Amino acid sequence: MKPKSSAITKFVPVEHLDKIGEIAVYYGFSPIKSPAIIKTDLDAAKDISEGDFVDDETERHGKVPLGVEEKIALMRTYEENDWASKSQPVQLYLKDPCRGASANSKKHGCHRYADLEILGASGPIAEATLIQAGRAMLKTEGHDNVHVEINSIGDKDSMARFSRELISYYRKNINDMTPECRQLLKKDAFELLASHEASCQELNKHAPRSMDFLSETSRRHLEEVLEYLETLKIPYVINNSLIGNRSYCTETIFALVDGVSQTDKSKQRVYGIGVRYNGLAKRLGMKKDIQGIGLSLLIKNGTNDLRDTLKKIKRPIASFVQLGSESKLMSLDVIERLRHAKIPLYLSLAKDRLGAQVSSIERFHTPYVIVMGKKEAVEKSVIVRKNDTYSQDVVSLEKLAEYMKKVEKDYWGK
């Protein structure tokens, strides 16, 4: 099969993308210019404190904040541009300039973020996509042993129940607290819960856990996220002290961390923080709530060229469709295998129904479609179908990358 028109080229122009961001594109993210933060965003953020941090490893005691005003600006942009009318979810890659870096950190090379945002997706595939894409980006930068720390604070009611029990626990044990622990409790009970002080950590061993207060819906959501991690063989631990900013965070909170220093948390490097913020749109007065989740990665601007700008990317010649829960669990493995072979796909992982997936990707008119159903998931294979002749081959996952390389070469005639 050849391109029907000579106007169809192998590469398509792109803006606001760098080399490390190209990895996100393979997972369905679209690069955009980061929304400008305006006065109304800052005003809306005044009552919401800084809550999530990514450690700056060149400043052992320094931290780079992730401001809620950025999420607010993103929500405003979603509404202003009527992204709700687009195929959902909206997956975005934001290539930001230096954010929150101090003068001292600039001496060591500027620190920059890679932001991944998914708007309009409530299912656990959103968390799994962010974690898988984030780890792939960090691995490209040389971080080969990235683990996941994860927790859930549930919905608003779950968090309220947990908060009451946590404060009650600390009050009952206040006589056993060190001055440092008491000072943290005076400031905020959750500051005490997140403390790395040895005396505070000893106290927190028996503290209530947010997961024990989850609603049935929140508990099931977390279990499904963990099922993805296990299927993808991503190492993870439950971190009960991972709470985030309770003013806007909901449900899942996770961190991408250096797996080497698991035994000594005080020396552990945090490469990224991911949070859900499902209720933020309503809180900002928007008519309809927007299910939101984002991951911010701290990327070094070192001697490599990962931050070099890309002007074009490969045009996908295939779409990917998954049918059933078993294939959905394996879908990210399929994408990662093809990403390594530099085979891009059009996909819509957050949609469950076949009709919704097809309507989302059919506008691209790809000459091939890759299908994974329940049978294929069990057999670790896919069906590769030609859309003009409806001929198809069953291809094992082990041979898929090699097969698609040949298909791509034949299609472009090179």
Feature roles, as predicted:
Residues 1-414:
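TRNA-recognition modules of translation machinery and tRNA-sensing kinases, especially anticodon-binding
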